[in-house]
Every structure is written in C-alpha cells, then in structure tokens.
Amino acid sequence: MIFSKDSNVTLVVTSCGRFDLLTRTLASFDAFNTTPIREVFITEDSGDRAVEACIPHHWREHTTFFVNVPRLGQLRSIDLAYSHVETPWVFHCEDDWAFYRPGCIEES
C-alpha cells in the first residue's frame, strides 16, 4: 500500500467487534490496492480498542481510530469518520469485505 500526503483519497472502514474479519479485509486491501491513500479512518462501534491491533504495521502513522463509547450505530459512525475527511474522495468499506485484484479504487 502506498500512502501519500498528495493523495485525494481517504479510506474509511466501519467495524463492530469482528476483528478477525477486519484483519482479513485490511490485509487484502493492503495487498491489492494500487491507489495512493492519504489517510485511513476506522470507526469501531464495539468500544473495544483491540481494533488497533488489526491494521498492518506500516499503516500506523496514517490511521486514526474512532472507538465509540457508547455505541453510535453504523450511520452515526460513518458520519463521525466522514466529518474528519479532508480529501475530495472517500473509499468506504466494511469490516467483512475482501479484495482480490488490483484496481478496485480506480474502477469505482
């Protein structure tokens, strides 16, 4: 995965306690994404900071976590993350997605 301050894309991921699925989703995105990403926002609606262990190590300095206590629900979690986005484009995914080939953002 390529991170760039010049990128016009932010990755937003919503999650709720399914850390095994989230880890797989992020690993597959890391393996196949070909578009530079400015930053990553992950909303975790379970209130569990264990979410921070799910990201690939090289994402750490580019990732912001929103761990909701109390729970906000999916739509408010999305609104929270989007309120911090500074890029014109958002690539949004959920904790149970799988990426299997390059070009997913470019083709979106």
Residue ranges and their predicted role:
Residues 59-72:
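Conserved donor nucleotide-binding strand/loop of the catalytic core
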Residues 69-76, 82, 100:
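A short, glycine-/small-residue-rich helix N-cap motif at loop->alpha-helix starts
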Residues 79-89:
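Active-site nucleotide-sugar/metal-binding loop of Leloir-type enzymes
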Residues 27-37:
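Short, acidic, metal-binding catalytic loop of nucleotide-sugar glycosyltransferases
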Residues 42-53:
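A conserved acidic beta->alpha catalytic loop
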Residues 97-107:
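Acidic donor-binding/catalytic loop of UDP-sugar-dependent glycosyltransferases
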Residues 88-98:
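Short beta-strand-to-loop acidic/aromatic patch adjacent to the donor-nucleotide binding site
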Residues 1-27:
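N-proximal low-complexity "stem/linker" segments adjacent to membrane-targeting elements
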